[in-house]
């Protein structure tokens, strides 16, 4: 899949499926609305209209189903007819699965995605997840030919006209962002260390005409970034704080996306075991998603100030490693007693959000991280967990997840009951909870929030993506689509405006609305 290029076109044109294999994909009632005249040129002379109709009549999705139309050159596949209220109407996860299993082989292939206009964005991002970029299989190096998959959307429902050129460009940039994030997460630490992650940031900056701000190694210590420095100081490649900033004329507010970029997490001296350490190359998933989303957002035009803050470190073991009982002074000015070196992500993010607040003057701070294993227990493998000081933004995150396919579900936000878990006798707080049975994912997020203050008047959103950052052995690029959708109202792109949840009806208590009115407006 690493040599596969995705192309989004308004019309993929006609071709014999034996020369260009084809997958037609959609919900069954949508597939029945596709006229034979539209698919005839892509299926003839191998498939007749009678065979096409017969294939549709045999499909019985439970939750999905597929039927070959001509050998292994043409297939029609059906998505679930219904989804539950906590799933995406696009059935995005099933799109990825069906493309992986049903798309015929070949150097030049075609996917016809049948859906309604509101599901186009989520469907495209789901398609992208089926084509990872990273591989080191020895056979792959011998297969140098570039393969292409052409994607055509056939729209049904109210807005059933052709897909606009601006939409196709947005889909290309969004899916490039998803695949970029997945590639970074899939790449092992012997290649994707803090130095090479900075190269990725510099590459995106050069493409966008932005010079990144980089603070690293001993300068972090000198300037008071005790969280990032303390986590990464034992590694061969030094830790860093990097920032990409987009500051357009006419901006009315400042947004900061803060990503956890632990390129590898051994656990430090509180070392992980042989079964829990493999896969910890994925601990940079938050920073990877922020990078992919920032690139796409700026390419599509972003009207407000947007800062992407990357907290990069390798949590390693060595003579200079942080020890349990050490006390670090963080950028917020607060001291932290280390009682678990494997609770490192919150330390680097605490510095990151504090920098966003103090130095960048952010009105809205969103941090994204593969923060806790407990997230998978709290909200599962498919839904990220959201923790926020705003009921309105909590509802917006959930709705954005359903619109883009990166699903989200809330955690309990109750600092007055939970923050005492970090009580320390010798410092302002410890870095790990006393009771691991007391909502540990919520507590981990609250640790981060405490470094900007629970009374901070701005909007703070924490997204824990530990479980959905991967599906099996492969990264998903989770978070890119979510950020683009959540902040779509600030985009100049009409498709991102469409998938933005803002302005939607939200189910919040009256008291929550009153508190939210004192916070910053939604973008």
Curated annotation (Swiss-Prot):
GO cellular component: cytoplasm
Binding site for Zn(2+) 1: 265, 342, 344
Residues bound to Zn(2+) 2: 260, 265, 283, 344
Enzyme class: hydrolase
E.C. designation(s): 3.4.11.-
Entry annotation: catalytic residues: 272, 346
Cofactor: Zn(2+); Mn(2+)
Keyword Electron transport attached: no
Domain of life of the source: Eukaryota
Gene Ontology terms: biological process: proteolysis
Keywords per UniProt: Aminopeptidase, Hydrolase, Manganese, Metal-binding, Protease, Zinc
GO molecular function, one term: metalloaminopeptidase activity
Pfam families per record: Pdase_M17_N2, Peptidase_M17
Keyword Manganese in record: yes
Free-text function comment from the UniProt entry: Probably catalyzes the removal of unsubstituted N-terminal amino acids from various peptides.
Assigned protein family: Belongs to the peptidase M17 family.
UniProt protein name: Probable aminopeptidase NPEPL1
Species name: Pongo abelii
Gene: NPEPL1
